[in-house]
């Protein structure tokens, strides 16, 4: 998901914010991953700012809270906008599913813990935007998601 970051930042003269430093190994490995999977050449990069839990990121007039939610990757971050009750969760949570944890340094237990301890406490009425697929709410997933619903043993 970050293969063009270095080129875009250079072309548009934009700073790179994030990810969390725990994903540095992914960034450093991008050139090799690109070759392995037949992508055009990918460049690694060094962010202008690594993101940590509790940071904020401002885009235009919107300020987003940063939540470090490891599991899918160790440095995965979620962006939360309290005024609009929206969370941009990437590949942590999906409608009826959760993110993969079979990547290097992914961890299923960390992912479940991130969802239950960082995301669900934000409120059942929070709409989330996943990295793929339809929108949902934390409340809906607490009710019916077979991986993290309240009915699943902890």
Language model features with spans:
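Active-site HxH/HxHxD metal-binding segment of metal-dependent hydrolases
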Residues: 1-58, 143-151
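Metallo-beta-lactamase
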Residues: 26, 32-35, 56, 62-68, ...
């Amino acid at each position: 998901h970050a293969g063009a970051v270095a080129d875009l930042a250079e072309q548009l003269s934009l700073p790179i914010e994030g990810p969390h430093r725990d994903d540095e190994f992914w960034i450093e490995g991008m050139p090799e991953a690109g070759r392995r999977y037949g992508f055009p050449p990918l460049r690694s990069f060094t962010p202008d700012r690594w993101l940590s839990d509790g940071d904020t990121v401002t885009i235009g007039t919107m300020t987003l809270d940063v939540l470090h939610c490891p599991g899918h990757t160790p440095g995965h971050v979620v962006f939360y906008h309290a005024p609009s009750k929206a969370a941009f969760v990437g590949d942590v949570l999906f409608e009826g599913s959760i993110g993969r944890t079979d990547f290097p340094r992914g961890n299923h237990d960390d992912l479940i813990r991130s969802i239950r301890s960082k995301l669900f406490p934000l409120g059942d009425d929070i709409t989330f935007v996943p990295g793929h697929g339809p929108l949902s709410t934390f409340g809906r997933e607490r009710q019916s998601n077979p991986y993290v619903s309240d009915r699943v043993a902890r």
